[in-house]
Amino acid sequence: MQRTGKAVICRELNQPVVVETIVIDGPKRGEVTLRIAACGVCHSDLSATNGTIPLPPPLVLGHEAAGEVIEAGEGVSSLAVGDHVVTNFIYMCGKCRFCSAGRPVLCIEQGKALTTPPEGTPRTHDAAGKPLNIFSGCGVMAEYATLSTDNLVKIDPKIPLDRAALVGCAVTTGVGAVFNTARVEPGSIVAVFGCGGVGLNVIQGARIAGAERILALATRESKLEM
């Protein structure tokens, strides 16, 4: 079924974003509709509004969010109504040679889900019925969103959704840099330049990895206090 709700939209590059009422279509095969509980604000959202990330407006912003499944489309078996999920803003088909090799971040089908669901038909429209693009296949700076299950990860319902939202980008980017890029080992000395949302999660990741010493550098004293 269709639903209406508020969303944050970039209508024009280098102009203030606007909050509008939008219409969200119900899920098709392999999709679910979410009630969004919380959405982080990432620097990538800013980059989409100024053209640094070249995605065409009108664009519903937001790619790191958490919410509850309220409707499931045909063929969905991995999620059910009532499940809590976080978004995954990098689409993966699960079938190409990179996905099959355990490197889904390099999925050759990513381009299918940059501004629409991977099937290619917009699920999000403005009040006049005109289609809206969605940022990185998500567009979750909104009250509702219909997404492919490939863009979602089920989580424990005990996890507060306002905290879980950050796992969609800030946490995975920071912790992933520690374990997958730098490959920090126990006893390492780690320097972290910048203590924003990602930097703080690099620090946490380094701690989990067993770093002997973590050096945090920031331009604002308030961030170091955290």
Residue ranges and their predicted role:
Residues 6-8, 18, 23, 35, ...:
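Residues located in well-ordered beta-strands
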Residues 1-4, 27-28:
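Extreme N-terminus of proteins, especially the signal/transit-peptide cleavage junction
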Residues 144, 150-152, 156-226:
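Mid-domain Rossmann-like dinucleotide-binding core that forms the NAD(H)/NADP(H) cofactor-binding site
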Residues 25-39, 49-100, 105, 113, ...:
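Glycine-rich beta-strand-centered segment in the early N-terminal region that forms part
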Residues 89-150:
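Cysteine-cluster motifs in flexible loop/terminal segments that predominantly coordinate metals
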